[in-house]
């Protein structure tokens, strides 16, 4: 009879292990959300090369800018928050890896019981002291793949946090570069405006002299004076933008607001050849797209976990240790005890908790799939936008340069004609105003080209290493 019981206990775990092959958990397959869509450009080559594989140090070569990027990657608050999210996800991953192992608990216990005189043993003992030193071991068979899916969900969550960390790095590099270039553009606009103010002060003196000579009226003097004040107001706005941008730039570096040292806009050159790669590379290079897919994997595996709750769970529990009424005999061989239990639990009625959890997991899985698809569409749009913006900015620089040259020449001619009495002052004022606006627009065009290059770098996945 004892042998029969022993065979039953040996057979139980063998059956449990053999049933583990009967998984109901589905294996993840990448959804059909990515198609070989084409970028809307004929200018850049679509081949295996991709500037996302190029380190940011090869794209942003300004020595001060590279130093700021390195400082930002080290100190930026968003980066440090992302690192902590990775650490938290890694802790869950370690937990998931141990899901197949049994749980072990130890227990040391002293029990004192006062007995009623009318109880079963009250006439023999007034009180009982019991001492126990024991341990218990519990193991659940992963028949339906719940533990495996939980482990994979934790793994996907960890990889998602890593990709999200990389996405924060790419965005930070782009933000630092873009803000730096914007500061350079403001420096140039401030320089031009200050130069314009000095020229208009000189023009005001000349106009006043012409009025004394009877060549212009008081109206001409006041219009020149008004143009001077217009330029001074523009300078105030530009310096305000400069201060606000410097404060924002300092925050990107993880620093308090401060003055930012920088070079000149004229020194900035685009030395890296722009390769956009092929559309499918977005899956490998865009960290936000990678994070979106891992989020979908996480939701998929959690749906497997929710589905497994419909099926019975098989557990094997063993307990043993020492138990005695006398502490002196606690470690005596006669105090040994042991228990081995195999259990099968099938959910029957639980207030629809399991079905609700499963339906919610299906809805969250579909949300994650749609977010993954949306991230692909957004990435394609951002690449197309950045490509066209770069092409347009490059073309506009040439046009704006010609426009400024024409206005500058017109200003020079009109002032000469005015001094010789062959032009009215309205022509001079118009030419000067157009020349200033055109020159400021030309600076913006140079900045827009650099900004488009930064956006293209980020849209393609950005070499954040």
Residue ranges: model-predicted function:
Residues 1-34:
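Bacterial Sec-dependent N-terminal signal peptides
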Residues 22-40, 70-142, 174, 242-260, ...:
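A small-residue-enriched
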Residues 23, 147, 156, 163-278, ...:
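Periplasmic alpha-helical coiled-coil/stalk elements that build and connect Gram-negative outer-membrane
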Residues 43-71:
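Regulatory alphaC helix of protein kinase catalytic domains
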Residues 80-81, 97-98, 141-169, 219, ...:
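Sec/SRP-type N-terminal targeting helices
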Residues 201, 230-258, 306, 402-460:
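Short segments within alpha-helical structural elements
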